[in-house]
């Protein structure tokens, strides 16, 4: 299928396109792919017979800079991170926040948020995912030693202590996040933020495995070292060639994970991307299609071309202090 996402910003039209073969999966799975989240569980309609080989080869646009949720920056990294790691919340097919590791949540005056974690959420090594994992992850995210590109992301949620931590005035342990018990996480904000829970679909808020990081250091994301809590785990990584993920049997919703293996390719050329799809080498292209090919492909393979609106925001951060 080709997915064409038109983006109108500042009077400039942009297109994002990808292609996915319908013969691979049922409609529900296809919808999950179109949402950009392969890991999203799917309900296979009654009477639908899936293809015998449930594997997916997709272009990811470029080589990733990292698989560490606190070191990633771009869309290619986020695509894979969402398959490997699951945060408190995820996005559903319509882009709305939905339960992830947290099966429910509540708040007091939009300032103190409590997340109730699934008791069956596990890491790929079989150990349980706990509230302490999120405390460690969020503290690591804002730690200057981590140098995370998204260290300031939690500032949008106004988590207590974060401004002073990022300024080096307080230790990371003063961040307003606390494990009440293994399955209850409490987050205290410096002011009411009604939309706080919506921020938690971002990959940088996912838990990370403390034991693996402490054991392997910077090499913790390599095959054989990495421990994940999402629908997939890392099988193979050949830089500038491919990244292969395989279904994780310990994932809490594994029964509804349909695709057994996902291979990501770093194809930068949009023309090459389309050509390799049409030759049968890949099942799904990246988001960008050469605009000059859109009408031609829409005519030749209309069932494989899908058009979606693309929403994004451009903004400037002005330093008005100096």
Name these PLM-found stretches.
Residues 59-109, 139, 225-228:
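N-terminal lobe/hinge region of extracytoplasmic solute-binding protein
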Residues 43-44, 294-307:
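Ligand-binding "clamshell"
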Residues 52-63, 103, 112-115, 134-137, ...:
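Short, well-ordered beta-strand elements
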Residues 96, 163, 168, 172-174, ...:
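Gly/Pro-rich hinge or "lid" segments in bacterial periplasmic/extracellular proteins
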Residues 217-223, 249-296, 311:
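Ligand-site clamp/hinge motif
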Residues 103-150, 186, 276:
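Aromatic- and charge-enriched surface segment that lines or borders ligand/interaction sites
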Residues 62-78, 101, 149, 196-206, ...:
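A structural "hinge/loop" feature
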Residues 92, 246-250, 310-322:
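A bilobed periplasmic-binding-protein/Venus flytrap-type ligand-binding module shared by bacterial periplasmic
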